[in-house]
UniProtKB/Swiss-Prot annotation:
Region described as Disordered: 397-419
Pfam entry (one): Methyltr_RsmB-F
Known role: Specifically methylates the cytosine at position 967 (m5C967) of 16S rRNA.
Lineage per the UniProt record: Bacteria, Pseudomonadati, Pseudomonadota, Gammaproteobacteria, Enterobacterales
Classification via InterPro entries: MeTrfase_RsmB-F_NOP2_cat, MeTrfase_RsmB-F_NOP2_dom, NusB-like_sf, NusB_RsmB_TIM44, RCMT, rRNA_ssu_MeTfrase_B, rRNA_ssu_MeTfrase_B_ent, RsmB-like_ferredoxin
Name listed for the protein in its UniProt record: Ribosomal RNA small subunit methyltransferase B
Protein keywords: Cytoplasm, Methyltransferase, RNA-binding, rRNA processing, S-adenosyl-L-methionine, Transferase
Active-site residue list: 375
Organism whose genome encodes this protein: Salmonella paratyphi C (strain RKS4594)
């Protein structure tokens, strides 16, 4: 492999772009994976996800072992050392290989003069590992979350916050959605077993299957033919609560990447679905999903606050609003969220959610259903949001999900092994 494609240096660059520049790992990682051999793509992903999952610990270790931080053009070396720590702590990479490859990464980022420094810090960590980890276990950094988020979780969930944090720090399971227009869930589970894999049905969501061991999608029976889709169990709750019917006009708002759009069409293949998202680039994923599953929907780019721009005066029988949110319920799946979000974002997101709710509610027919959903666990975006909406919207009534004082259903991450998710089902009087 060429030196500029050193795996450890690429991982360090990816993490730096997330933490220092606020870029999403889902945007940063794919181009870097193109620079390495196919056999190394999984390791590069593991290093990036792992470092971001344990960033608080790795930062704490650097502060203990280095007298001053790396800054300026040497900043990538800071993250390269983190990659070294992560390998020594959490991977099966032999320590000598982890050290050698990480030190060599300095050449790839044009800092060969710092090879000795990197080697020295990593070896010092090896010598002091037990003492350092014992001290870390009593530090504030042990939660592996930014302090502002820990405080919010403690306030919202006085008896459950530790469980939420622990779930966020785990690797996520792989959930699938069986396409009921092709197979029953039990029938597809039989095909999965024939392929040498095992899956488990979800007790509440009728299409959901959890793989015993995550697998590449090309190994799943009928994936290319649209028999099955990768989608977390909690996300599948949206279509369950929406309960779409054939012949209805249905709006899926904030629809990208299209997992919920296609689930609606699996449940009601003859529904007339309009899928709208503000992000034109992400809409390409909606088209891809519709094509793979052989489905049709109208897809438009648009801002949820201004429905007249993308649907005129049209009204809908059902609306799914998967609102823009903090994504604090899917941290185990996207650990970069912890470092991309800021405390001040929550109030701004809650304001945006309220504006979208108020804008689309008039587009719901009398007697129609709106399901408000987020992948957040924060009350400001969920129960508080719906409580204030009900107070200012006299023709809105809660259905099935919670009570007026505690509206909606809040799934916490790890519950039945799904992600953190919130749903509120509203009926127009």
């Amino acid at each position: 492999m060429k030196k500029q494609n050193n795996l450890r240096s690429l991982a360090a660059q990816a993490v730096e772009q997330v933490v220092e520049q606020g870029q999403s790992l889902s945007n940063v990682l794919p181009p870097l994976q193109q620079k390495v051999a196919d056999k190394d793509k999984a390791l590069l992903q593991e290093l990036c996800f792992g470092v971001l999952r344990t960033l608080s610990q790795l930062e704490w270790l650097i502060n203990k072992l280095m007298s001053r931080p790396m800054t300026g053009k040497q900043r990538t070396v800071h993250y390269l050392i983190m990659v070294g720590f992560y390998q020594l702590l959490y991977t099966r990479v032999p320590p000598h290989a982890a050290l050698a490859e990480t030190v060599e990464g300095a050449v790839s980022i044009k800092r060969p003069q710092l090879k000795g420094l990197i080697n020295g810090v990593l070896r010092q960590f090896q010598r002091q590992q037990e003492t350092l980890l014992n001290e870390f276990a009593t530090s504030d950094a042990r939660f592996l979350h930014p302090g502002w988020l820990v405080k919010r979780l403690q306030n919202a969930y006085p008896t459950q916050w530790q469980r939420i944090i622990d779930a966020n720090n785990q690797r996520p399971p792989m959930w699938l959605r069986v396409n009921r227009t092709h197979h029953t869930r039990d029938g597809w589970l039989g095909l999965l077993e024939d392929a040498g894999m095992k899956g488990y049905p979800h007790p509440d969501y009728p299409d959901a299957v959890r793989l015993e061991t995550p697998a590449p999608v090309h190994a799943l029976p009928g994936f290319a033919e649209g028999w099955v889709t990768v989608q977390d169990a909690s996300a599948q709750g949206c279509a369950v609560f929406l309960a779409p019917q054939n012949g209805e006009h249905i709006l899926d708002l904030c629809a990208a990447p299209g997992g919920k759009t296609t689930h609606i069409l699996e449940v009601a293949p003859e529904a007339d679905v309009l899928a709208v998202d503000i992000d034109e680039q992400r809409l390409s994923r909606v088209y891809d999903n519709l094509k793979r599953l052989g489905m049709k929907a109208t897809v438009k780019q648009g801002d949820g606050r201004y429905p007249a721009q993308w649907c005129g005066e049209q009204q809908f029988d059902r609306i799914l609003l998967d609102a823009p949110c903090s994504a604090t319920g899917v941290i185990r799946r996207h650990p970069d969220i912890k470092w991309l979000r800021r405390d001040r974002d929550i109030a701004e997101l809650a304001q945006l959610q309220a504006e979208i709710l108020d804008a689309v509610w008039p587009r719901l027919k009398p007697g129609g259903t709106l399901v408000y959903a987020t992948c957040s666990v924060l009350p400001e975006e969920n129960r508080d949001q719906i409580k204030t909406f009900l107070q200012r919207t006299p023709d809105a009534a809660l259905s099935e999900t919670g009570t007026p004082d505690q509206p909606g259903q809040q799934n916490l991450p790890g519950g039945e092994e799904g992600d953190g998710f919130f749903y509120a089902k509203l009926i127009k009087k």
